[in-house]
Amino acid sequence: MSDFSMETLKNLRQQTGVGLTKCKEALEHAKGNLEDAVVYLRKLGLASAGKKEHRETKEGVIAALVDERGAALVEVNVETDFVANNSVFRAFVTGLLSDLLDHKLSDVEALARVMSSQEPSLSVEELKAVTMQTVGENIRISRALYTPVSSGQSVGIYSHGNGKAVAMVFLSGSENQEALAKDIAMHIVASQPQFLSKDSVPQEVLEREREVFSSQVAGKLQEVVEKITQGKFKAFFQEACLLEQAFIKDPEVTIQGLIDRAAKASGEPLKVEHFVFWKMGA
């Protein structure tokens, strides 16, 4: 039987900001004494972290990893750019990627509950508290994504600005087109498309754009309106859709043209299945 009440456990969690498991451990070690439990957590480097949890976090890093387990992406924020480049913080972020891949998670709350691959005796939430204590700043895991990688897929990752923006591209038809996938990922970071293709643009977006275009040519003859509207839609697709965009490294060819050229050269049926683009704080 425990030597402490649920009320004491609740008070310890509120006072320290430390996770449930470690608070139980502390109270068991302290035989139910709240003050001794706080001291125990402080010795572990956990207790003072809770005081930092309400500080604003505007800096940080977006990190990505792909291996035989799949592909993972995580955004982790801190207070200053100095800590964002700190080796301890970066190691914590790298560990999160491995945790996402191990557990196939895209949920931040679920990630916080799993045991850390870096420090198996601690949950991710508890290791975050230890890392906060070490770097002296608040840390917030903002978002996470796990995506399985199928056989016959190539995945390209491009990171810009030391992790301020990251794109990940999933290319089907070959496992040997990482360079092409990375080139497309680099293009995505530079051009920031909203959609993959014309067919993937939601109907409500098309209707909104048509309404805007129509208002711009109100009063003109119908055939003129149609011609102008078609031209405006073409320009919209070229700006908003990845496959319609001019390749940043060779504007004479579209991204679809680039893929077709590579497919012809390799004899492989290459296709961009989907992409992910994250920008810090967006």
UniProtKB/Swiss-Prot annotation:
A Pfam family hit: EF_TS
Cellular compartments per GO CC: cytoplasm
Any GO MF annotation of the entry: translation elongation factor activity
Sorted UniProt keywords: Cytoplasm, Elongation factor, Protein biosynthesis
The UniProt record lists the keyword Cytoplasm: yes
Disulfide bonds: none
Region called Involved in Mg(2+) ion dislocation from EF-Tu, residue ranges: 80-83
Gene3D superfamilies for the chain: 1.10.286.20, DNA helicase RuvA subunit, C-terminal domain (1.10.8.10), Elongation factor Ts, dimerisation domain (3.30.479.20)
Location relative to the cell: Cytoplasm
Function: Associates with the EF-Tu.GDP complex and induces the exchange of GDP to GTP. It remains bound to the aminoacyl-tRNA.EF-Tu.GTP complex up to the GTP hydrolysis stage on the ribosome.
NCBIfam families in alphabetical order: tsf
Family assignment from sequence similarity: Belongs to the EF-Ts family.
Protein name: Elongation factor Ts
Organism: Chlamydia trachomatis serovar A (strain ATCC VR-571B / DSM 19440 / HAR-13)
